[in-house]
Amino acid sequence: AVLKNEKVEYFDVVDIFDRVVGLAPREYIHANKLFHRAVHVFVFNNQGDIFLQKRSMNKDSAPGKWVSSCSGHVDSGEYYFDAAVRELGEEIGLHYSKDLNLAMIEQARPETGYEHVHLFVCNHDGELKLDICEVSDGIWIDLEKLDLWIEENPIDFAWSFVYLWKRFRR
């Protein structure tokens, strides 16, 4: 993840079939709507609630919006699973992968920000250590309450999260 005024990051550019076709800076990829890779992780507790994070106002996309438990781009040459493990550690302080499971794959499209997305799920009860540079807040929320919140106030959420959540809930 890149905050405003940080170094340039390069990601793999991929085709519609998720095959690597090049390498480009993050900003160029986003400006030109090139297909690239990302991961999202939904973390659930034993009560069945999901953890949501509120993005820092310093983020360059969707600042201050509620999103997945964690998410991020897949680095060049990195596997999706490894990116999910890395993002869990960086954003919310979970440094393990024992029950991290692939739940869904979404092909790159406008609704995903032109990202091929692998959505993972895992369970966790206990403390989370939020990275204050990336995350401004976090909550555990009941799934039905989240559905209602999204229905009543979709503006509170990153649009890509809303898309993925609705696909996940089908």
Language-model features: where?
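Nudix hydrolase/Nudix homology domain
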Residues: 27, 64, 104-107, 111-170
